[in-house]
Amino acid sequence: MNLRKATMFLLLTSLPSMLAGCRGFGSPFTDGGMSDSSTGASGEVVISKMGGGIDVANAPHGATLSTMGGGIHVGSVASFARIKTMGGGIDIDHATGSVDAMTMGGGITINTAEGPVKAVSMGGGITVHEVGTSTQQRDIHLESKGGNIELTVPKDFPMDVKVTLAYTRTDRQYRIVQHAGLDVHESGEWDRSMGTPRRYIRASGIVGSGQNRVTIETVNGNVILNQE
């Protein structure tokens, strides 16, 4: 075998391992950039990126997604979704399982959810729309350090609700909008224990059996609770 043939043979035999080593680059699940993407033993989609957005069309067995800088979009996810970005928005079209989403700088939108939701934003608004008639436990925790929060639930959704709205400006312009019969109270004194003086508007109450725990917390933002 001459040198040219030997070189060609070496390239052909090493090609499969070279392609395997490129997994995560140009993945159909991502928008490019350096990433590590894989499918878990149970079929879940797992993507971790050092920078750039993530776009997953369908994750029927769950998804664990994270990026150090970029937005994350999921079309449809079942079972569970664990999503985190250090700088960008999170958008989920439809989730039938549990959702745990966190962003350090952006909004969170879940267009339709049929399970428990935990959504935390360090600097953006949150919008969640719970649908369906499932009797499973569907606790909801929504928290923003600076933005509006809007939660929509089915009209007969049983819940134990606690809402805390803090504002730091003397000319109060924020409010809790709800028609669920919650008790609403506003503090009279400025609380300086958190550094920046703030006042609180709180709302609480039980709707139906109170089966599902709903907690909503925001700073300098409105809270809207819809029942439909």
Question: Residue spans of the language-model regions?
Answer:
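Intrinsically disordered, low-complexity terminal regions
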Residues: 1-228
